[in-house]
Amino acid sequence: MQINIEKNQKEIKAHGNYSFPVNVSVEKIEAYEQGAFLWHWHPEIELTWIMSGEMEYRVNDQSYLLKQDEGLFGNSNTLHAGFRQGSKECSYLSITFHPRFLYGYDNSVLQEKYVAPVTEDERWPAFKLEGNVVGHQRILKWMQEIYEIWEKRPSDYELEIHILLMQIWQKLYRYVTRQPEQGQMSGGQLSRLREMVAYMEQHYNQEISLDDIAEHVNICKSECCRFFKKHMNMTIFEYLMFLRIQKSLPLLKEGESVTKTAGMVGFTSPAYFGQIFKRYMKCTPKEYQRN
């Protein structure tokens, strides 16, 4: 399983609908291929609570290690990915909702005074919710209450969820507006990073050179390497290999030969594909097919 995305890395999945733009679900990180969901973004705000295990959650150029009973606020339109940590299974609660669910209609006081100052602030792509911080505990508790309401679906569950999300937002708003500025990437840098990731997503099955990627975002090769490594905590080559292996998994499961799969995901040598596959998956392509 993997997240479905458009060419620009935007997630295709609907998070609720126009009349009630909220989605609540319990996910398992190990359900995703390689124990990771790939980089994507969506206009919805996302709240995460770790129910068991651990996860590395990356948002733009920041990395957060989330343990059981900790959580994360992920802002609207941020590029993010999640990676399993250790051998234990990791289950987490995900609550996604569109900002308009908070403010109602464009240019309202709620939007301009309380929502936009947070969702449009590039300094706050995310922040961690600690289980031992009183204010954070309250937010995490409200998140759990939302899940319970979602599961039971009382007759007024939409109203109850709206009230709890407004309480959560009030806490988040006060927290963000009272904190000193953080050193985060600018909107232009985020746009460049999205373009680089999207380019590899669109061309992973072709021969891609550093020149191609640098030219696509209009920077020199050395700056291209430095920029990607700084913000993604991995080299361009490492990300491309990771992406290609991810793309190979459903093909192998469908019964494609190793040789054909290698070519379909951008490897010119089946032997090299097998070598990289084993590095990431700890087994050969044939062993993966059998299991």
Please give the residue ranges for each predicted region.
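Solvent-exposed, amphipathic alpha-helical segments
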Residues: R138-K152, R192-H203, K247, L251
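Generic protein-terminus/edge-of-domain signal
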Residues: M1-G71, N77-L79, G86, L110-K113, ...
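Amphipathic alpha-helical segments enriched in hydrophobic/aromatic residues interleaved with Lys/Arg
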Residues: S108-Q167
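Short hydrophobic/aromatic patch on the recognition helix
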Residues: D69, E223-F228, Y272-F273, F277
